[in-house]
């Protein structure tokens, strides 16, 4: 006898019922059968495809960057409000407060996309974060290339460091931001003017405020900015006992500087231009700038890759949820169809029970046997023995024809078997026999042959 697997290891077909369900259905318990059918399909949750570690790592990193961006934005707004000045289109680049505010706001927006996309499992925000990070890195690379181009280009025409410094000298009196930038460069780099190594200070003759033309009404005519004065002159004047000496010495160092020779001004102001010291400073830090930009690609690539991985996991998890929802819909429809079938079976069983009870209560009719079919007599034409009686005459042809016509008439007028009446009584049977004998005697019905 073959070995039979235990019940807990036996599997049924997807559309078939278990033996308990079939037994319940056949035993007339549809309610319990429906409960078994509905409980057989349990709601299965799809597997979790989103890595919790990756999700919260992206969220925390972007949250920290967002807080840093908020701090930078607050600092820029504070500096702008503290030293409020008229804002022009060029001030977006020249005003440090505006630059700091724009930088902080950009960090806030990009990091907001990152941590909100990770928190809410939003694919669109995650992809926006990755795209913004990549575009920001491209922008940093482009700005670095522009700076390298500016400082390594010696042309006096076109975009170069020389052109930018001359533009700042010419518009020194019109833009406060340009004036502050030039003063900071001349003080920190110990230079005055732009290009010339020995007579760079003479570039201020192109300024509307310091030129030596007769049409210049400004009191700073033929002078240079105060930032061109040497720090040693100011410190010596500050150490004297006369409190007015520093102010007087600072006025003497820059007034009428454009009318003097470089040898007479070496102890009072800086005579070399700022282009060469600025280029030397950039060249000394060019390697560091390039290395920083090159290494910046590492965190950018890491953040973009992690964000894309998280977005793919979210997308796959969404696909699994949608697939499970479709399966649940099909399962509900299948259960609904099964319930309809069970209900129809219940209705059929109730109908059979009602018919059986109605038949049981209906009175039975009396047992009457079915009517017997009538006996059909097929006439047979037989030869009759000649009569031995001498007095009897043979029949004529006319009599024979009349007898044949009567036979045909009797045959056509005879009642069909389907329309036969009730079974004949004994008296009717006797009458029929007498009538048959009379007909035989009159030669209308042939006699039976004697064996």
UniProtKB/Swiss-Prot annotation:
It holds the Pfam family Tetraspanin. Expressed in the germline, particularly in sperm cells. InterPro entries: Tetraspanin/Peripherin, Tetraspanin_EC2_sf. Residues 78-96, 152-285 are extracellular. Disruption phenotype: Viable and fertile. No effect on sup-17 localization in embryos. No effect on tsp-12 protein levels or subcellular localization. In a tsp-12 (ok236, ok269 or jj300) mutant background, exhibits vulva morphogenesis defects resulting in vulvaless or protruding vulva phenotype, impaired egg-laying with severe maternal effect embryonic lethality, smaller body size and reduced RAD-SMAD reporter expression, a reporter system for the sma-6/daf-4 BMP-like pathway. Males have severe tail defects including crumpled spicules, fused and shortened sensory rays and smaller fans. Glycans are attached at residues 205, 211. Residues 410-434 have a biased composition (Low complexity). Residues 366-376 have a biased composition (Pro residues). Residues 328-451 are annotated as: Disordered. The chain crosses the membrane at residues 57-77, 97-117, 131-151, 286-306. GO terms for biological process: nematode male tail tip morphogenesis; positive regulation of BMP signaling pathway; positive regulation of egg-laying behavior; positive regulation of embryonic development; positive regulation of vulval development; regulation of mesodermal cell fate specification. It is found in: Cell membrane; Cytoplasmic vesicle membrane; Endosome membrane; Early endosome membrane. Keywords: Cell membrane, Cytoplasmic vesicle, Endosome, Glycoprotein, Membrane, Transmembrane, Transmembrane helix. One of its GO terms (molecular function) is protease binding. Residues 1-56, 118-130, 307-451 are cytoplasmic. It is a multi-pass membrane protein. Residues 435-444 have a biased composition (Polar residues). GO terms for cellular component: apical plasma membrane; basolateral plasma membrane; early endosome membrane; late endosome membrane; plasma membrane; recycling endosome membrane. A motif (Basolateral membrane targeting) lies at residues 20-24. Functions redundantly with tsp-12 to regulate cell surface levels of the BMP type II receptor daf-4 (but not BMP type I receptor sma-6), probably by regulating endosomal sorting and recycling of receptors, preventing their targeting to degradative lysosomes. Together with tsp-12, regulates cell fate specification in the postembryonic mesodermal M lineage, body size, male development and vulva development, probably by positively modulating BMP-like Sma/Mab signaling. Together with tsp-12 involved in maintaining the structural and functional integrity of the endosomal network. Belongs to the tetraspanin (TM4SF) family. This is Tetraspanin-14.
